[in-house]
């Protein structure tokens, strides 16, 4: 079942999920649009300077709070019910439709030029690594709860033969 973090505010829904499902998917909470946010937030060092990655890009701060609310609920349930656990299908690491436009642009500026293929591939790799580390890294409190990830959502569509129609898309950038 797909659930949203706000749905967990209702006891009836929590009980329904526990009673009838052994697998859930976050509706939107694990999508780049939610984790990255509407505007980029950059990591800063102890002196207040923006941290830069190996490409010279500012290091993004990711917001896992909405998905973590769901993961905390599942983790707590699983700890209390080891013979009746619920697992999570991670959805989704890459999706052109629900990724903020600024993620594809120079300096993460929505007015900047689109980055080239190599830079975009590196950004995607860094983003995916951070998400996977958060949810299944050695020190993650959620390690082992996610059993599968949808890596790329809706990659193939009729407009794939005309990527110039959507120059900001992952498809166009990576061609």
Residue ranges and their predicted role:
Residues 19-175:
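Substrate-binding cleft and catalytic face of glycoside hydrolase catalytic domains
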């Amino acid at each position: 079942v797909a659930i949203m973090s706000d749905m967990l505010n209702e006891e009836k829904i929590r009980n329904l999920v526990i009673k009838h499902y052994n697998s859930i998917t976050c509706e939107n909470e694990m999508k780049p649009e939610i984790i990255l946010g509407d505007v980029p937030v950059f990591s800063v060092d102890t002196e207040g300077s923006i941290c830069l990655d190996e490409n010279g890009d500012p290091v993004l701060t990711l917001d896992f709070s909405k998905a973590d609310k769901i993961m905390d609920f599942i983790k707590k349930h699983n700890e209390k019910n080891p013979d009746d656990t619920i697992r999570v299908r991670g959805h989704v690491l890459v999706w052109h439709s629900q990724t903020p436009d600024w993620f594809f642009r120079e300096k993460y500026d929505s007015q900047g030029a689109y980055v080239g293929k190599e830079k975009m591939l590196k950004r995607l790799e860094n983003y995916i690594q951070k998400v996977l580390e958060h949810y299944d890294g050695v020190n993650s409190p959620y390690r082992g709860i996610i059993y599968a990830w949808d890596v790329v959502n809706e990659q193939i569509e009729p407009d794939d033969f005309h990527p110039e129609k959507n120059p900001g898309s992952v498809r166009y950038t990576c061609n």
